[in-house]
C-alpha cells in the first residue's frame, strides 16, 4: 500500500511514523447516513448480534436501532432542529447508549452529563450548549427541572416493532453532522465545550491496524460520558460491530475488584488511563491476559507497569496513545513491545487514519529532525472548534492562513505540546510549551511554583522540575532546586512550611538545596542536568545505604518499597519517618498498599500509610502478621477518618450543675483565641465587665511574657486599648491547643479546671490554602483537649465558636434550599468535602462537640456568618478574605459574578454581644445558633449588592465579569503585594471538575435562625440583626485607608 498520501512531513524520507487507512469489514460503505447509518447497517446485516450487555441482559443491534428510532421520534415531535444540543443524564447501563443513539438518529447533538456533577455545573454545560431538552433515566428524573425532560423508557418492544423499524433507514446526516459535545478538564476557568463531528469517529473506527476490534469483542464502558474516551467505548465499539459492556465507575476505588470484574465480564477491549494502569497491573498482573487490545494514555506512559503486563499476562495489542479532546480521542499511537519497556523508551510511531502532523517553531516554521517544536494536528479527527469561544477557537484551530507552513486544504489544531521527531520519524512528547506539566493527575505550572518559592524571600534562585525515575511505578514528583539566601541557617522545612501557607498541597515540592545552578548553551538553567544529577545522586545514596544493611530484614525491604513509590525522596528514609512527612500522596499510599500486600501478604489501610505509621512501626506491624486495624475513613477524604473521634476521648461529664459564670463568686474566665479578630473583641468586652474577676488567655508562645505581648499587640492593632478596659484582670499563659494538657502541664491544667467558671473557645487555625491535616491539630485535637479541660475539675459551661462553613456548599452539592440550626450535622458530611481544610476541621470539631452535648456536657455552639467590622467604629480585619477581595477588586476595577452567593455578614460587636448575652441564659444550654440575619433579611445576592456599594464608596466605575475572566485578570497583576495573591490557590484550585471552592458556594441555602430569633427576641440591641449597608461599608473602608 502506498502510504505517501498519509504521511505528513515525511514524504521525502523513510520513517517509522505511519498512517493507516482501513480495510473495510463489510465492503464499501455509504457515509451519507452518518453514524446512525452505521448502526442501521449492523442491525440489518446481523440483527441478533449483541450491541450492549449489562447486568445479565442484552440489547441486540436490531433492538438498539428500534429503541433509538422510537426515542428519536419523541424528540422530533418536540420540534428539535438540526444539531440541536440534547442533554443526556443517566447512570451506568443501557439508557446512556440508547439515548445517544436516539439523539444521533434525530439529527441532534449529544451533550452527555455526569450525574455526580453539582447542579450548577450541569446547568452551565446545558445552558452553554443551548440545550432545552434532556433525556434522563428514572434516577435522575427530578434533577433538571429547569429543562424539558424526557424519560428514557426501556420497556419491552415487540418483534413487529423491530421489523417495522428495520424497514425505515434513519435520517441522512452525513459526516459533517455535529454528533457530540465533549468537555475538557482544563486547569483554569470553566470547561471548554468541544464539538465532535461524525467524520472524526468514522475516521478513527476505520483504522483497522490501530483499532483491531471485531464482532466478537467486548468493550468495557466506564469513562465519564462527558470525556472523549467514552466516545471510543461507545461509538467506536458500535461502528466496529462489537459489544459494549457498561461497568460502574464506583469500582475505581477497589482496583483488585475492578480487575476481577473485567475478567468476569469477559472484557476484551479496555481504555485505561495511564495513572490507573499501574494500580490495576500491580493488583493483578495477569489482568489483561486474553484481551484483544488495551489502550492507555492521558499522561506519559508507565513503562514498568506495561512491562509487567507484557511479561505476565499480555493482551494481543497494548497501545500507548496520545491525542487531545480537540482531535477526538487518539491522533498518534504506538504499539508497545517488551523491547520498548526494557529499553525504557516509548515513542509515538503511528498516525491514526488520515491524520497529519506538523512540528513548528515559535515563528511558525518547520523544525528540523532532532529539534523540538509545537505539535499541530490535522485531518478528519480535528474538531470544528469550541462552543461560544470564538477567540479561543481562532487561536487554536488554524489553517495555512495563520501559519503559511501548514499544508493547504486541511484544518489543524495547535496542541501547545512540545515534541521532537527523530531522523527515523519517531515522535517524543516533552510536555507543555507553557511549562505546564501533569503530576499525579494535577496540572502544575512550574513557573507558578517558582514564583511562589521566590515570594517566600528564602531563596535567590530556583528551578521547579518534574522528576521521574526510570524505576518509578507511580509517575512523577515535583522537585524544586534552590539556592538559599542564607545557606548557613536555611533548612528545606523552612521553605516547605512557608509554601504550605501559600499554595495547594500538591504544589508544595520536594526541596533540593544547590550551591549553584548549571547553565546550558543558551545561558539558561539546565533543567535536564539538574534532574539527571538529582536522580544519579539519589540512586547512589540508596545503593550506599543498601550496602550497609541486611537487605533481607523487613524494615530494609519496606524502606526499598517506600523509596520506589516516593520518587521525590532522594535522602535516606529513617526509621522514624512517616509516609506523610516525606510528602506521600493518597495515590502513592494506595500503591504502597498494593506493594505491601504483594510483598508481605498483609492488609493495611490508607490512613495507616499516609498519616499514622512510621517506617519502624509499619515494619513491626508486618512482623506481627498484620494486626486487625480499622478506622472510619474514606480513602481520599482525610476528615472522615475523624468523624467518630469523640468516642476515643472516653469522656464523662462532671456531676452537678455548672455555675452562672457571672455569679457573685464566679467571674473567672478561661478563653482561647484572644489573638484572633473575634477573640480580641470578646476579651476587650469581658475586661470591661465588673462581674469578670479575671480572664486567663491560652496563647501559643514561648513563654508567658511573649504570650501577653501577643495579646496586647492585637488589642493595639484593633484600637481596643481604652480607659474602660481593665487589663490588670488579664493573665496570658503560654500553651498549645493540640497538647492534651493544653501545654500547661498536668498540675496547672487541673488547677485551672477547678478555677474556671466557664470556657470561651474561639481559638482556631485558619488558612484557606491548607488542607485538613494542617488544621487538624489546632482545630480538631485542640477542641478535643478543650473538652478534656471541661471534664476536669468542677462543672463549667463551654461556649464554642464554630462557623457556617460546617454546612459546606450544601446548596450546590445537596440541593438544600434551607438548613436549620438543629439539623443533624452528618447531613452535610458530603458537602463539606468540597470546602477547604479549615471548614472540614471545623465540621469534625463541631461533630465532636455535638456528641459531647448528647452526653450532657453543658455546651452552646455559635455559628457566625462572615465576621465583619465593628458596626460603630468600622474597625475590621484587613487580612481576612472579604477585606482582601474588596481591596483587590478596587484595584482591578472589576469584580466577579457570583450568582446567589451571600456572606451573611455579622458585625463583630453584635456577635460578641450575642454570645455574651446567650452565655448568661440557661435556655442556651445544648443549643446551636446560626448567628446570621434572620430568614427574611438574608439577601439572595449579597455579594453583588456588596460590590455595588463598594463601587459607590470608591466613586469609581466597577465592571462585573465572569469569574474565570476576573480570575485571569487578577493573575495578570504583576504585583506581589496584591492582597489576594496569597489566596490564589483557593480561588483557582479546582475542587470538583472546574469549580473552585469559592464558586462552590453559589446557590446558597437559607440558614435557619429559629433558636437565635427565639432567644434574642426581646433583647434590646440584639433583637434586630444589623445588615451590611452603605454607611457601615464606608466606615470599614475608611478604617483600612481604602477610601
Swiss-Prot record:
Cofactors (names): pantetheine 4'-phosphate
Any one Pfam family match given in the protein's UniProt record, by short name: PP-binding
Record gene name: cpsA
Chain ranges of the Thioester reductase (TE) domain: 672-915
Homology family: Belongs to the NRP synthetase family.
Keyword hit for Phosphoprotein: yes
Alphabetical UniProt keywords: Alkaloid metabolism, Oxidoreductase, Phosphopantetheine, Phosphoprotein
E.C. code: 1.2.1.-
Reaction catalyzed: L-valine + ATP + NADPH + H(+) = L-valinal + AMP + diphosphate + NADP(+); L-tryptophan + ATP + NADPH + H(+) = L-tryptophanal + AMP + diphosphate + NADP(+)
GO molecular function, one term: oxidoreductase activity
InterPro entries: ACP-like_sf, AMP-bd_C_sf, AMP-binding_CS, AMP-dep_synth/lig_dom, Far_NAD-bd, NAD(P)-bd_dom_sf, PP-bd_ACP, Thioester_reductase-like_dom
Pathway: Alkaloid biosynthesis
Family matches, as PANTHER family: BETA-ALANINE-ACTIVATING ENZYME (PTHR44845:SF6), CARRIER DOMAIN-CONTAINING PROTEIN (PTHR44845)
Modification O-(pantetheine 4'-phosphoryl)serine, positions: 586
Comment text on domains: NRP synthetases are composed of discrete domains (adenylation (A), thiolation (T) or peptidyl carrier protein (PCP) and condensation (C) domains) which when grouped together are referred to as a single module. Each module is responsible for the recognition (via the A domain) and incorporation of a single amino acid into the growing peptide product. Thus, an NRP synthetase is generally composed of one or more modules and can terminate in a thioesterase domain (TE) that releases the newly synthesized peptide from the enzyme.
Region (Adenylation (A) domain): 41-386
Gene Ontology biological process terms in this record: alkaloid metabolic process
Enzyme class: oxidoreductase
Domain Carrier as annotated: residue spans: 549-626
Known uses: Campesine G features good insecticidal activity against the global honeybee pest Galleria mellonella, which supports its future application in the development of biopesticides.
Described purpose of this protein according to its UniProt entry: Non-canonical nonribosomal peptide synthetase; part of the gene cluster that mediates the biosynthesis of campesine G, a dimeric indole piperazine alkaloid that shows good insecticidal activity Galleria mellonella. CpsA catalyzes the first steps of the pathway by producing L-tryptophanal and L-valinal from their respective amino-acids. These products condensate spontaneously to form trypyl-valyl pyrazine also known as didehydrocampesine A. The NmrA-like family domain-containing oxidoreductase cpsB is the next enzyme in cps pathway and reduces the unstable didehydrocampesine A to campesine A.
Protein name: Non-canonical nonribosomal peptide synthetase cpsA
Entry annotated with the keyword Transmembrane helix: no
PROSITE patterns reported in the protein's UniProt record: AMP_BINDING, CARRIER
Chain positions covered by the region annotation Short-chain dehydrogenase/reductase (R) domain: 671-914
Amino acid at each position: 500500500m502506498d502510504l505517501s498520501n498519509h504521511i505528513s512531513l515525511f514524504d521525502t524520507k523513510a520513517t517509522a511514523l505511519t498512517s493507516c487507512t482501513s480495510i473495510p469489514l463489510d465492503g464499501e460503505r455509504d457515509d451519507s447516513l452518518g453514524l446512525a447509518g452505521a448502526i442501521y447497517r449492523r442491525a440489518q446485516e446481523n440483527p441478533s448480534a449483541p450491541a450492549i450487555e449489562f447486568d445479565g441482559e442484552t440489547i441486540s443491534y436490531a433492538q438498539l436501532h428500534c429503541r433509538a428510532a422510537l426515542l428519536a421520534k419523541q424528540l422530533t415531535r418536540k420540534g428539535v432542529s438540526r444539531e440541536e444540543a440534547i442533554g443526556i443524564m443517566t447512570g451506568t447501563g443501557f439508557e446512556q447508549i440508547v439515548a445517544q443513539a436516539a439523539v444521533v438518529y434525530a439529527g441532534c447533538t449529544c451533550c452527555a452529563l455526569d450525574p455526580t456533577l453539582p447542579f450548577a455545573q450541569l446547568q452551565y454545560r446545558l445552558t452553554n450548549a443551548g440545550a432545552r431538552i434532556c433525556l434522563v433515566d428514572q434516577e435522575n428524573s427530578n434533577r433538571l427541572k429547569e429543562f424539558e425532560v424526557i424519560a428514557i423508557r426501556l420497556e419491552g418492544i415487540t418483534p413487529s416493532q423491530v421489523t417495522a423499524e428495520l424497514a425505515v433507514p434513519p435520517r441522512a446526516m452525513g459526516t459533517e453532522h455535529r454528533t457530540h459535545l465533549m468537555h475538557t478538564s482544563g486547569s483554569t476557568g470553566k470547561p471548554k465545550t468541544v464539538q465532535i463531528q461524525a467524520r472524526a469517529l468514522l475516521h478513527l473506527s476505520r483504522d483497522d491496524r490501530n483499532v483491531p476490534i471485531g464482532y466478537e469483542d467486548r468493550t468495557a464502558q466506564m469513562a465519564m460520558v462527558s470525556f472523549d474516551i467514552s466516545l471510543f467505548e461507545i461509538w467506536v465499539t458500535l461502528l466496529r460491530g462489537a459489544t459494549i459492556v457498561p461497568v460502574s465507575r464506583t469500582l475505581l476505588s477497589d482496583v483488585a475488584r475492578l480487575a476481577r470484574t473485567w475478567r468476569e465480564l469477559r472484557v476484551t477491549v479496555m481504555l485505561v488511563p495511564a495513572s490507573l494502569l499501574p494500580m490495576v497491573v500491580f493488583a493483578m498482573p495477569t489482568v489483561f491476559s486474553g484481551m484483544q487490545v488495551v489502550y492507555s494514555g492521558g499522561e506519559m506512559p508507565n513503562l514498568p507497569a506495561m512491562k509487567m503486563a507484557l511479561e505476565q499476562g499480555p493482551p494481543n495489542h497494548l497501545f500507548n496513545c496520545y491525542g487531545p479532546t480537540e482531535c477526538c480521542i487518539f491522533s498518534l499511537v504506538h504499539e508497545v513491545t517488551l523491547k520498548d519497556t526494557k529499553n525504557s523508551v516509548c515513542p509515538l510511531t503511528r498516525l491514526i487514519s488520515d491524520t497529519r502532523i506538523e512540528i513548528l517553531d515559535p515563528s511558525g516554521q518547520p523544525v528540523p529532525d532532532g529539534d523540538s517544536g509545537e505539535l499541530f494536528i490535522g485531518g478528519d479527527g480535528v474538531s470544528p472548534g469550541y462552543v461560544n469561544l470564538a477567540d479561543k477557537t481562532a487561536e487554536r484551530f488554524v489553517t495555512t492562513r495563520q501559519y503559511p507552513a501548514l499544508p493547504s486544504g486541511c484544518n489543524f489544531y495547535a496542541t501547545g505540546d512540545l515534541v521532537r521527531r527523530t531522523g527515523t520519524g519517531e515522535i517524543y512528547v516533552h510536555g507543555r510549551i507553557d511549562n505546564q506539566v501533569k503530576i499525579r493527575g494535577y496540572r502544575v505550572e512550574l513557573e507558578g511554583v517558582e514564583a511562589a518559592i521566590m515570594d517566600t524571600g528564602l531563596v535567590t534562585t530556583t528551578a521547579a522540575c518534574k522528576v521521574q525515575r526510570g524505576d518509578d511505578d507511580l509517575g512523577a514528583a515535583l522537585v524544586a532546586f534552590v539556592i538559599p539566601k542564607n545557606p548557613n541557617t536555611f533548612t528545606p522545612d523552612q521553605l516547605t512550611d512557608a509554601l504550605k501557607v501559600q499554595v495547594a498541597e500538591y504544589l508544595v515540592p520536594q526541596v533540593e538545596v544547590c550551591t549553584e545552578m548549571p547553565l546550558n548553551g543558551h545561558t539558561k538553567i539546565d533543567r535536564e542536568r539538574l534532574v539527571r544529577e538529582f536522580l544519579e545522586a539519589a540512586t547512589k545514596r540508596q545503593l550506599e545505604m543498601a550496602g550497609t544493611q541486611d537487605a533481607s530484614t523487613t524494615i530494609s525491604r519496606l524502606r526499598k518499597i517506600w523509596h520506589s513509590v516516593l520518587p521525590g525522596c532522594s535522602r535516606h528514609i529513617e526509621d522514624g519517618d512517616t509516609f506523610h512527612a516525606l510528602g506521600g500522596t493518597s495515590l502513592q499510599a494506595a500503591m504502597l498498599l498494593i506493594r505491601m500486600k504483594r510483598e508481605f501478604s498483609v492488609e493495611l489501610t490508607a490512613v495507616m500509610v499516609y498519616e499514622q505509621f512510621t517506617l519502624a512501626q509499619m515494619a513491626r506491624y508486618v512482623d506481627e502478621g498484620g494486626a486487625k486495624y480499622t478506622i472510619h475513613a474514606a480513602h481520599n477524604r482525610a476528615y472522615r477518618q475523624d468523624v467518630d473521634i469523640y468516642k476515643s476521648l472516653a469522656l464523662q461529664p462532671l456531676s452537678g450543675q455548672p455555675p452562672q459564670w457571672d455569679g457573685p463568686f464566679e467571674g473567672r474566665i478561661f478563653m482561647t483565641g484572644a489573638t484572633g479578630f473575634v477573640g480580641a473583641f470578646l476579651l476587650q468586652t469581658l475586661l470591661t465587665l465588673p462581674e469578670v474577676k479575671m480572664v486567663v488567655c491560652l496563647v501559643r508562645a514561648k513563654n508567658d511574657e511573649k504570650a501577653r505581648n501577643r495579646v496586647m499587640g492585637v488589642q493595639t492593632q484593633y484600637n481596643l486599648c481604652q480607659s474602660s478596659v481593665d487589663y490588670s484582670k488579664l493573665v496570658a499563659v503560654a500553651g498549645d491547643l493540640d497538647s492534651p494538657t493544653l501545654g500547661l502541664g498536668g498540675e496547672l491544667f487541673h488547677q485551672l479546671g477547678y478555677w474556671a467558671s466557664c470556657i470561651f473557645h474561639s481559638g482556631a487555625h485558619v488558612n484557606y490554602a491548607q488542607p485538613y491535616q494542617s488544621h487538624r491539630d489546632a482545630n480538631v485535637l485542640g477542641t478535643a483537649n478543650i473538652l478534656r479541660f471541661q471534664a476536669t475539675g468542677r462543672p463549667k459551661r463551654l461556649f464554642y465558636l464554630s462557623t457556617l462553613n460546617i454546612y459546606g456548599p450544601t446548596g450546590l452539592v445537596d440541593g438544600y434550599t434551607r438548613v436549620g440550626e438543629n439539623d443533624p450535622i452528618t447531613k452535610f458530611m458530603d458537602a463539606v468535602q468540597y470546602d477547604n481544610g479549615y471548614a472540614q476541621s471545623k465540621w469534625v470539631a463541631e461533630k465532636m462537640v455535638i456528641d459531647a452535648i448528647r452526653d450532657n456536657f453543658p455546651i452552646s455552639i455559635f455559628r457566625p456568618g462572615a465576621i465583619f467590622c465593628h458596626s460603630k467604629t468600622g474597625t475590621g480585619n484587613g487580612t481576612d478574605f472579604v477585606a482582601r477581595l474588596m481591596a483587590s477588586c478596587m484595584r482591578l476595577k472589576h469584580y466577579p459574578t457570583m450568582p446567589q452567593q451571600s456572606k451573611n455578614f455579622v458585625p463583630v460587636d453584635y456577635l460578641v454581644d450575642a454570645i455574651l448575652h446567650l452565655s448568661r441564659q440557661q435556655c442556651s444550654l445544648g443549643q446551636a445558633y446560626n448567628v446570621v440575619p434572620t430568614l427574611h433579611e438574608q439577601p439572595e445576592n449579597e455579594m453583588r449588592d456588596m460590590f455595588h456599594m463598594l463601587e459607590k464608596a470608591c466613586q469609581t466605575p466597577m465592571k462585573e465579569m465572569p469569574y474565570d475572566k476576573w480570575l485571569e485578570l487578577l493573575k495578570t497583576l504583576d504585583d506581589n503585594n496584591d492582597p489576594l495573591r496569597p489566596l490564589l490557590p483557593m480561588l483557582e484550585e479546582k475542587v470538583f471538575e472546574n469549580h473552585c471552592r469559592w464558586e462552590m458556594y453559589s446557590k446558597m441555602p437559607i440558614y435557619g435562625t429559629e433558636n437565635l430569633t427565639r432567644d434574642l427576641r426581646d433583647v434590646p440591641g440584639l433583637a434586630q440583626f444589623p445588615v451590611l449597608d452603605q454607611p457601615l461599608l464606608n466606615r470599614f473602608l475608611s478604617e483600612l485607608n481604602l477610601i
